[in-house]
Amino acid sequence: MARNKPLGLKIRLMKAVKSNRRVPGWVMVKTDRRVTQNYKRRNWRRSNLKA
């Protein structure tokens, strides 16, 4: 990808990076392990972003 990106695209890509993380440990403790997985996880090879 190009080095110089438009700001809007950069922000959308950064949001995708942030949201692609596992559920924090404190959330599992708080919800008594009812929430253990992030179902919106995305793999860079398997699915594309609409950024």
From Swiss-Prot:
UniProt-recorded Gene Ontology molecular function terms: structural constituent of ribosome
GO biological process, one term: translation
This protein's name: Large ribosomal subunit protein eL39
Keywords recorded for this protein, A-Z: Ribonucleoprotein, Ribosomal protein
Family per similarity comment: Belongs to the eukaryotic ribosomal protein eL39 family.
InterPro entries (alphabetical): Ribosomal_eL39, Ribosomal_eL39_CS, Ribosomal_eL39_dom_sf
GO cellular component terms listed in the entry, alphabetical order: ribonucleoprotein complex; ribosome
Pfam families per the UniProt record, alphabetical: Ribosomal_L39
HAMAP family linked to this entry: Ribosomal_eL39 (MF_00629)
